[in-house]
Amino acid sequence: MDQSKGTVRGFGARLVVAVPYLWLVVFFLIPFLIVLKISLSQTAIAQPPYLPVLDLSAGWNGIKTFVAGLDLDNFATLLSDDIYARSYLKSLEVAAVSTLILLFIGYPLAYGMARAPRRLQAVLVMLVILPFWTSFLIRVYAWINILQSDGLLNRVLQAFRLIDTPVAWLSSDTAIYIGIVYSYLPFMVLPLYATLEKMDETLLEAAADLGAPRWRAFWLVTVPLSLPGVGAGALLCFIPITGEFVIPDLLGGSDSLMIGQTLWTEFFSNKDWPVASAIAVVLLCLLVVPMALYQNLQTKNVAG
């Protein structure tokens, strides 16, 4: 009886461990392999709109024909046309600059929240996540009304006589950065707050006892201890911003072509699934790099 209970418990423990891996296989690995397969195919006027299609009913010959029909032409297309390289570089530039802006804005906010009275902290956290209760698309559309020529921002600036004529905020990089910072600020603030809130206050007291002024204690104690939160917040912002489509499409101009817009055009307008899939594969490979670097740093910190 005890042996059977131990067997059941052992199976249950293995099942619990296997569930996350099963989740990754079903919702990440299999979809990625499908996208990778399409990226190695050729565009066709068919359904689905690419060839070759694996025909298992043909047996081994069908598999050989399928493999022989795969090539790297779509990736060569990405290298031959400058528009794709410019889109990737623009996306990485916007993501990097936006992440830095979010860090400079989010760190003081998170620090203030972590130092606020305990009862007030819950209210502040709720205020940070409150925008998520509204549709993302509606929030972006609201910025169109705010940033347009006769919008709220221009009216306020003119009322304070800071500008004489309305500024063309829309269809510019400035509008994109405003929309991104507004939309992704909670993703930076919450990891930073979680890290700063758990910090041991006695470390700052010890630094003060040793004669360190508050600003020096902040840079030597608080900042290093908050780096895991900085890294987590940066990843949570940088990765989705790189593939952002809605904000640059609604707030940006023709000179603000990001890779998400290029992918959407290839997939829906040009109906070129293989090239769109190749764009997605390259984008994923680019985003794996910062994730791997962050994981490597985390491993070194734990080992150290």
Segments (PLM) and residue ranges:
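Membrane-interfacial helix termini and adjacent extracytoplasmic/periplasmic loops
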Residues: G6, G62-I63, V140-V181, W215, ...
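Short membrane-interfacial helix/loop motifs at transmembrane-helix boundaries
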Residues: I30-D82, I146, D150, V156, ...
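C-terminal transmembrane helix and the adjacent membrane-cytosol boundary/short C-terminal tail
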Residues: S4-G6, Y193-A208, P274-G304
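Transmembrane alpha-helix signature in integral membrane proteins
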Residues: D81-R115
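Cytoplasmic-entry segments and transmembrane alpha-helices of multi-pass inner-membrane transporters
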Residues: G12-V17, P108-W143, L204-E205, F218-W219, ...
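N-terminal signal-anchor/first transmembrane alpha helix
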Residues: M1-Q42, A122, M126
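Glycine-rich helix-loop "coupling/hinge" segments at transmembrane-helix boundaries
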Residues: F245-W273
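Transmembrane alpha-helices
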Residues: V19, M126, L130, Y182, ...
